[in-house]
A protein has these predicted regions:
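Substrate-binding pocket helix/loop in short-chain dehydrogenase/reductase
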Residues: 97-117, 213
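Canonical Rossmann dinucleotide-binding motif of NAD(H)/NADP(H)-dependent dehydrogenases/reductases
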Residues: 3-33
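Active-site loop of short-chain dehydrogenase/reductase
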Residues: 6, 81-83, 138-151, 184-187, ...
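Active-site-adjacent segment of SDR/Rossmann-fold oxidoreductases
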Residues: 21, 177-187, 239
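A short, exposed helix-loop element centered on a Lys and neighboring polar residues
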Residues: 131-132, 176
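C-terminal substrate-recognition "lid" of short-chain dehydrogenase/reductases
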Residues: 2, 221-248, 253
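Catalytic loop of short-chain dehydrogenase/reductase
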Residues: 107-115, 139, 146-170, 175-184
Length: 254
């Protein structure tokens, strides 16, 4: 599928990788329905994309709300005059060891269930509802389409990220499940698993910590959103790609 033919939803689009994907698609002439809980970021995205060949439509979206998801997908379909793509990018972190001993008191601390539920609610349940509602619209319209899930190399296991690892692992597994389920509907499903990507947090790291991080990455640098976009673009455009997850991590998980 050519990028200019896309009418695609992007979740978590107010900043970071989601905003970068939206700009790249608008530059290519695609229509984008950008959703996020951060309305200020969405407004900035819309302004940044003004005048580009494509068009970016924005609306507040909380993917952890089933009602929000249904209403957003219905709105996106109407705003763009159709729907043939989804980039499932929204995600949150609530990091912490599942069980740990407090260094000062020696007391045993446990990961709060609320933190677990919050991460799974956005990163897995929310992502699943987005796929369900988007593909249902594609199928009802008889439209061929593509879904790109954002997994993570954390799915290989990462200390202090039980909830995040569980969600991203499940999303990678269901990428294959959904590719099999949706093939008869003309919908492909792929996933990208980013490694360490440049963010305000990594940019604010002290040099010693940053150097230690980079030393573990074979290509010798932290990734940029553009690195991830190149993999996302491949999945969107390659009609013969289906059911697989691409690690884009500079070799960190080798």
């Amino acid at each position: 599928m050519q990028l200019r033919e896309l009418k695609v939803i992007i979740t978590g689009a107010a900043q970071g990788m989601g905003a970068h994907f939206a700009r790249r698609l608008a530059e290519a002439g695609a229509q984008v329905a950008a959703g996020d809980v951060k309305e200020e970021g969405l407004a900035q995205l819309a302004e940044a994309c003004r005048g580009l060949p494509g068009r970016v439509h924005t609306r507040k979206l909380d993917v952890s709300s089933e009602a929000d998801v249904g209403e957003f997908v219905e709105w996106a379909h109407g705003a763009m005059g159709g729907l043939n793509g989804l980039i499932n990018n929204a995600g949150i972190l609530r990091d912490g060891l599942l069980v740990k001993r407090d260094r000062e008191t020696g007391a045993i601390r446990k990961l709060p269930t609320a933190d677990w539920n919050a991460v799974l609610g956005v990163n897995l349940t929310g992502a699943t509802m987005m796929v369900r509602e988007t593909v249902a619209h594609m199928a009802a319209a008889g439209a061929r389409g593509v879904v790109v899930n954002m997994s993570s190399i954390a799915r290989h296991g990462n200390r202090g990220q039980s909830a995040y690892v569980a969600a991203k692992s499940a999303l990678a597994a269901n990428t294959l499940t959904w590719a099999r389920e949706f093939a008869s509907l003309g919908v492909r499903v792929g996933a990208v698993a980013p490694g360490m990507i440049e963010t305000p947090m990594t940019k604010g790291m002290n040099q010693k910590a940053r150097d230690a991080l980079v030393a573990n990455i074979p290509v010798g640098r932290i990734g940029e959103p553009e690195d991830i976009w190149q993999a996302v673009r491949f999945i969107l455009e390659c009609d013969y790609f289906n059911g697989r997850t691409i690690d884009v991590d500079g070799g960190l998980s080798m």
